Amino acid sequence: MADNPVYLSVSDLNFYISQKFKNDPYLHKVFLQGELSNFRFRMHSHQYFSLKDDKSKINVVMFRSFFEKLKFKPEEGMKVYVSGYVDVYGPQGSYQFYAQTMEPAGLGALYEQLRQLQEKLAKEGLFNEDHKKRLPLFPDRIAVVTSASGAVIHDIMVTANRRFPHAEIDLYPAKVQGDEAADTIVASLKQIQAQGDKYDVVIIGRGGGSLEDLWPFNEEKVVRQIYAMQMPVISSVGHETDTTLADLVADARAATPTAAAEYATPNLADVLTKIVQLRARLYAAMQANIRAKRQILDRLRKAPVLQEPTRIYDQQIQQVDMLSHRLNQAISNQLQHDRSSVRLLQERLKALNPGRRLEQLERERTFIVANLFSTMTAYLKDQRNKLNRTMQQLDDISPLKTIGRGYVYTTDQEGNTVTSVDKLEIDEKLKLHFKDGQVQVNVENIRREKDGNQEK
């Protein structure tokens, strides 16, 4: 034992050991694999747990900034790969591992492969929204690609039959897990595609599972076949938190098989309710239109021109009388003027006593009077002819003239005009209107012209 030993403080010793760790290049970046132990998730905080194998364990700290970058959710007992460094925690004098990265053991390569394939297919446009097809409103036949023995097909059939029993569901069995799963899924999709337009929509799916279990739905061949389908495809793979490339390329994604069936089918009860509502709205609109037309008809029926058709000619007759009066007055004025002129000439002739000139003027006077009378008579005749033609045209379009040719119009007991047999009933009393009176009749039978043989 040394004569003068140097006693270190606990802090000094811990600091010394810490410096040893920091100066050791092998401890600057350490890669470990092991099983998560004592893992209790702390939200918005640093994570403290252990990493163990079958012989020993080490305490691990993962600061919040590193933990929030993880692309998966660590769980107790999960085997993981971690990287970081070793250091001493001075206050407790214990060394521990400070983790900076973590990924599931055995899945790191799969995640990297998945990331690269997703980037490749995204660049090709397989996930673009403009390629997505609309789901049919009323599918007649639905094809389902899934395991024949799982609960997926049962949930889909139960939900679809409850919502829309009209739709037929055909199962195309496929392995949904394992090395052969991708090939069987592609084969079933191609078989559906070969049916042409037999199916309106396709549902592809399986229950939840690990990344390895769901891997067939990340296979490139499966993704490309879904993209090539002519009909819409609904993907229901895994749980809501799981996302596969099949989900990204499909036209719609459902969190569960039940949700997939709901996407694919309408709710018949909702459809029937909507039909009833639309039917009521249509009936109300038709009734409103009929009421409006009846109001117009009533106004026309009460119009003075139909109540007293002869009033149509009143203005024309008055105009003819006025023109006749003006014509007669013009003729009278002209004759009076001519007589005055003749008398004036006679006076002048008497003063001059020109015999021959007088005779010539008399002949001119007689000619002028005759020509004027003839012109006025022709003008009056032409005006009367125009008046007669106008009155004839008005008479031709008169409702009374139509009745005069043998036509009648029919009204019911309320005085409404009957225009169709659709609303008539047997033994209903009607009134026929002739030009000179009315006749009351009873309906004995009804014959519709549209089918020629239906009688009521």
UniProtKB/Swiss-Prot annotation:
Pfam families (UniProt xref): Exonuc_VII_L, tRNA_anti_2
Keyword vocabulary terms for this entry: Cytoplasm, Exonuclease, Hydrolase, Nuclease
This enzyme's EC code(s): 3.1.11.6
Compartments where located: Cytoplasm
One GO MF term: nucleic acid binding
Record-level GO cellular component terms: cytoplasm; exodeoxyribonuclease VII complex
InterPro entries in alphabetical order: Exonuc_VII_L (IPR003753), Exonuc_VII_lsu_C (IPR020579), OB-fold_nuc-bd_dom (IPR025824)
CDD domains to which the protein is assigned, alphabetical: ExoVII_LU_OBF
Catalytic activity: Exonucleolytic cleavage in either 5'- to 3'- or 3'- to 5'-direction to yield nucleoside 5'-phosphates
One of the GO biological process terms: DNA catabolic process
Main EC class the enzyme belongs to: hydrolase
Taxonomic superkingdom: Bacteria
Subunit structure: Heterooligomer composed of large and small subunits.
PANTHER family: EXODEOXYRIBONUCLEASE 7 LARGE SUBUNIT
Role description: Bidirectionally degrades single-stranded DNA into large acid-insoluble oligonucleotides, which are then degraded further into small acid-soluble oligonucleotides.
Similarity field: Belongs to the XseA family.
The protein, known as: Exodeoxyribonuclease 7 large subunit
